[in-house]
Amino acid sequence: MKRLFSAKLIAALSVAAAVLTGCTTGTEETLQYVNLSQVSCSFLGEGNQPLVIEVKASPATWEATPGATWVKVERTDDRTLTVTVDDNDTGAERSTTIAIVADQASQEIRVNQLAKDNEFARFRKLDTFQMGAAMSPSGKYAGGFTASIAADDSWQYSPTIVDLETGEVYEFGPFPESLYYLTQTMAITDQGLLFISDGSNGGQIAIDLTGNIFIPEAPAGFTSKPDIQGTSADGKYWVGFGMKGKAFEDETPCKALLWTDGVPTELPWPDLNYRDEEPWYGGMARGISANGEIIYGTSWENWDFGMLYWVNNGANTEKPKWVGEDVREVWEETMKNSDGTEYTTHLVNGLICQAQLTKISPNGKWIASSYRTETPAEDRLSIVTTQTAAFYNTETETTTIVSDYGESVGVHVTDDGIGFIGIGTLGISSGVVYDLNTGTDLGSTQDWVYDNYGIIIPAGYINYVSADGRFVLGTKAESSAGGVNFINWYIAPPVAK
């Protein structure tokens, strides 16, 4: 285990990069290239240490040119570039590039610098994490994993936990992909127990602050390892799902699960599915309120994604209700196959949820969702849908549909009814904030963060806010040479000095 502490420099995942160019001089061809030990780096707003980057180039003579005056570069020898940055007094995040040129070969280093911390809050990116990050229910920890390349050119993974109160970082491994092929971060408890999916062996690993690893177990009779999706703040309850049988062979093989002190039990399932028809696959539990009282999940049959919730009573938990029952409508409709034959099905206007894990408020009073309508197309060969953000109050059992923003998704909601909405339905890159009590638009994600924390952040949307409001987890879309990446960021109180 590496036990790292808050550093003056945050360096992004190092990626070796090379640009090769063939040049012909008379009858002789020479190979020109620029090979960098690191093609991107991030700095804090102030107090940074110099960053050294290794440069291998042919021809050996190369030049480095920064794209902004706040970045300083020095070629300290034939193969070393030292990068320093001025303190960032702009109040906002900034970025630029450094161009490395060796005759006709060239490469760029992307440089990013955060704004200075203020006395109320600090903003950090988790851009070294692969496949996202999870925040614990009370905001104590954030967890994820980093990836690197082993000596044999295979992948290796390092589970990583960040203490958001102290800035301390716990890094474990790296573990070879042949042992743990880590694919997605799912959840972390306030006690620092991190759950990451294993794409090779199935199920997940669970790793704690000491580096101890175990594999969560499903109830007896299950045919696969389970997946934990969320936890309560005290770590007593975990929720998720597992397979008990095979699809199309066994009745509702996908089972929602609840663990109490590590012991798993099946959660009951509705008699009829989202379309008021016989269920054939089942579904999952996706999240649980921080206080452990309310669990939410989703059906997983075709494109239904019907959202439901349970009132947690341990092994005696009763069957769930559909989220948004007060606005849910189900009716019979005659549709057509491509060959012109007709069949009867049921269409639904109701609340849905896919694989999102942060849709419930800490005390379980509110659930964020999406209200989807279904209408037969004119030729009745397909179904036309609309989708808009919606929020359900589990105490009053009433739904608030927010249609102000067109196609949108309810991402998260606080105990006092502040809703966070993602604009669009796929590849969301921006968000707005809405007061469900007054029906008031509170502005964009950036506006709300500035109004409440006094800092300027880049565009994005909010995934989760702790019950006391001190910790925030969000998502930002970043463009790179490989396309658009979605990275997580967090807001936390300043580290005590």
Regions found by a protein language model. Give the residues of each.
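Short coil/turn motif common to extracellular beta-sandwich-like domains
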Residues: E46-V52
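Surface-exposed loops/turns
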Residues: G45-E46, T90, D415
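Conserved "turn/edge" positions that cap or connect secondary-structure elements
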Residues: D117-K497
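Short, surface-exposed loop/turn segments at beta-strand-coil junctions that are enriched for proline
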Residues: D86-A92
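Surface-exposed binding patches on compact interaction domains or structured appendages
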Residues: V34-Q38, V52-T82
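A generic beta-sheet turn/junction motif
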Residues: A57-P59, P66, A102-Q104, G406, ...
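A short beta-strand micro-motif common to beta-rich folds, especially ectodomain repeats
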Residues: A92-Q104
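Bacterial Sec-dependent N-terminal signal peptides
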Residues: K2-R3, A7, A11-S42, D103-F129
